[in-house]
């Protein structure tokens, strides 16, 4: 069920920069201002882990980060990141297989949820939601379609490419906003990047 980008670890960041410039990075950095000092942070699907470097720049110490990533090669790159004096627990597994206490202050899912079918998206969302405290913020970044013709072409090309190279299950975007709404999360902030093809959302439990 889980999307696994293990085969793309060595070229993923370079490909992202080639296609999107800094848009993928900027969309995620935009959300980091919401990470609380001394917070307990859950990151699911962190990829190559560059976001840990940026978190350490903002919060050099005090964070307790649990970093869940299913792809071993991605995890190997993530472990090499500069985390400052923050405490990081690396878990190389799918989030639905992980047993953690339900005491996280904030969750980040960068380009994770758009990899699943609607059925499996609901399961993944439930697994993460169960680990969050009441009123917790969930910071999500995903691709989105806003009616521009080129977005569908790029999206289809991405799904075909990563289905062939990494075996992702999705062939179209799932209903991410709808799924959050059904789980009674409140949308509190949103921002778009790269011609509205990339959307960041902040939800509150």
What are these regions (language model features)?
Residues 141-183, 191:
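C-terminal alpha-helical "lid/dimerization" subdomain adjacent to the S-adenosyl-L-methionine
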Residues 1-11:
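N-terminal, positively charged/glycine-rich alpha-helical extensions of SAM-dependent methyltransferases
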Residues 122-134:
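A short glycine-rich, Lys/Arg-flanked "PGG" loop and its adjoining helix->strand segment in the class I
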Residues 37-38, 132-138:
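Short glycine-dipeptide loop
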Residues 42-97:
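Class I SAM-dependent methyltransferase SAM/SAH-binding core
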Residues 108:
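A conserved beta-strand element that flanks and buttresses the S-adenosyl-L-methionine
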């Amino acid at each position: 069920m889980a999307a696994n980008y293990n085969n793309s670890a060595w070229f993923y960041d370079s490909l992202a920069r080639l296609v999107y410039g800094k848009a993928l990075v900027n969309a995620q950095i935009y959300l980091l201002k919401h990470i609380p000092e001394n917070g307990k942070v859950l990151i699911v699907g962190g990829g190559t882990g560059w976001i840990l470097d940026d978190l350490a720049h903002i919060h050099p110490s005090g964070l307790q980060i649990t970093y869940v990533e299913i792809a071993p090669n991605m995890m190997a790159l993530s472990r090499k990141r500069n985390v400052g004096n923050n405490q990081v627990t690396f878990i190389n597994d799918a989030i639905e297989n992980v047993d953690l206490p339900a005491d996280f202050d904030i969750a980040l899912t960068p380009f994770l949820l758009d990899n699943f079918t609607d059925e499996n998206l609901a399961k993944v969302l439930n697994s993460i939601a169960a680990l969050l405290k009441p009123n917790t913020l969930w910071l999500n970044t995903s691709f989105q379609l806003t009616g521009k013709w080129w977005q569908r072409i790029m999206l289809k090309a991405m799904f075909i490419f990563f289905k062939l190279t990494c075996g992702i299950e999705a062939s179209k975007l799932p209903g991410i906003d709808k799924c959050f709404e059904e789980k009674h999360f409140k949308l509190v902030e949103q921002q778009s990047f790269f011609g509205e093809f990339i959307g960041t959302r902040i939800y509150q439990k």
